[in-house]
Amino acid sequence: MKKLISIFILSLLFINTKADTHYINSGNFYYSPSSLTVDVNDTVVWLNVQGFHNVNFDISSTTGNSFGNPVSFISSPTGADTMYIHKFTVPGYYEYDCSVGSHAASGMIGNITVNAITDGNGVANGTSLT
């Protein structure tokens, strides 16, 4: 039993637990970068460079259909320097836009891929990825 506990504790050392913070600039009709890949537990900060914007991960402003994201959320429109901060805890592919005026129709759209944390053996959250 001691051997199993030791192996378990050692395996925890190899699990990626480091969380990063990523920044997206928001300006007149753009998010930069517009496409981003992060890991589960990473935080994304949207910075407002210019204008009045939000981040909408719920309903597409151009089609009126749900983005179908693993988790849906929307921030309030703001002109503040920091628009929104979100910690991604659910892996998957997320699409979003700015739902202020016609910003999305003018190209203010983006996507984020959230990768599951793996243990180095292709196992994420107890589920084999292979």
PLM features: what roles do these ranges have?
Residues 2-7:
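Sec-dependent signal peptide recognition
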Residues 15-19:
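Sec/Tat signal peptide C-region and signal peptidase I cleavage site
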Residues 20-119, 125:
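Extracytoplasmic copper-binding redox domains, predominantly the cupredoxin/blue-copper superfamily
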Residues 11-12:
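Repetitive helical segments and hydrophobic/amphipathic motifs
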Residues 126-130:
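A short beta-strand segment in extracellular, disulfide-stabilized domains
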